[in-house]
Amino acid sequence: YRIGVTPTLGPYLLPQVLPEIHKRFQALRLFVREGVPAELSQDLRSAKHDLILSTQPIAESGLDVSPLFRESLKLVLPLDHRLASKDVINRMDLVGEEVLTLDEHHLYHRQVTELCQTLGANTRRDFEGTSLDTLRQMVVMGMGITFLPALYVASEIRETDPLRVADVFGVNMYRDHALAWRSRS
């Protein structure tokens, strides 16, 4: 099977689930390719993929979509940020903050931008990352704060990293993931 995944999900979820899938279905061959959600949906429709694992929304025309799970987003700050030492960070603390995000070609950019609008924060347009790793490194260098998916945080951020990872109280921060396939397959 040819599976398309988003680069902000696949590398952090698949290592947790593929070993069990291979254990249960030893003859199953999976070919994984990353892409942004719009490309993945198009590639699924044109039969370049058999399945896609993506963040919602997935353009559903001609596709069957099965919601899988909701993933929380975490606030990530450099240790010298004014909020890093607070025991509890609430939504009002983020009003006016400049938030780093991925470039606009990623669905994650839109999700973070919408979250920032809800919080009264602003996305930085002068520095945009091309990967979640880039965002993490930009925060380490003190270039700003960001929101990172919980699966990424669990996989890539260590206690020894010079970062504070926090929840923000008073706002639901999450993204939804789904599996999609062609309706006729």
What are these regions (language model features)?
Residues 1-61, 129:
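Central regulatory/effector-binding core of bacterial HTH transcription factors
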Residues 2-4, 52, 76, 100, ...:
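Short, well-ordered beta-strand segments
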Residues 3, 43-45, 94, 137-143, ...:
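Hydrophobic residues within well-ordered alpha-helices
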Residues 9, 13, 163-185:
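A late-sequence structural motif
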Residues 28, 44-54, 73, 121, ...:
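Alpha-to-beta junction loops
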Residues 60-99:
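Flexible hinge/capping segments at coil-to-helix
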Residues 64-74, 150, 159-173:
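Short beta-strand->loop
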Residues 98-119:
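Secondary-structure junction motif
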